[in-house]
Amino acid sequence: NKGCSQILCKADEIEKVVHDIDQRIRQEHFAGDIFPTNVAPIIEKSEHGLKLDVCKWGYPLSQGKNLVINARAESVMDKPSFRNGILYHRILIPASGFYEWNRLKEKNTFSRYDAPVLYMAGFCDWFENERRFVIMTTAANESMIKVHDRMPLILEKGQLKDWFDDRKMEQILHQVPVQLKREAEYEQQSLFL
């Protein structure tokens, strides 16, 4: 488990950032939990700003069924398989939150304290006529470290366009994400014992 392996998505708040949302995308792809291999909503650069599209989560590995679902911010530029995506096909993955499991396989939900949507940095590329994406991860901050040593690279709302700017990308790759709110199912269950 390398960090961020399931995300939760709801549409309403994303419409405030991306004005031109295809209603078909809205109905089909904001259904709740999204897993690797699922099609997920993504935000990408367009002529008029930012636009919403969909993309399948996970780069296929050549030897079989396994997928690469995350890319480390610290080493992404050194990996030939990621180079084209990070340089030319950066995207944002909007989500209401994401799930992470601790060493005891207990599920934790992470979301923002201050906003209903978090924006994860990522990139995509083409594999046999199909576009696929990965989510960028970075070292866990204080809000995450007790559960996992990695976390998604989360951008602030004011940085969304910066992610598509080659001059600002490198700085974003090294930033520490915002502190997140954690809700743990196992802690909630224990209240009712």
Language-model features: where?
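Short linear sequence motif anchored by a di-proline
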Residues: 1-193
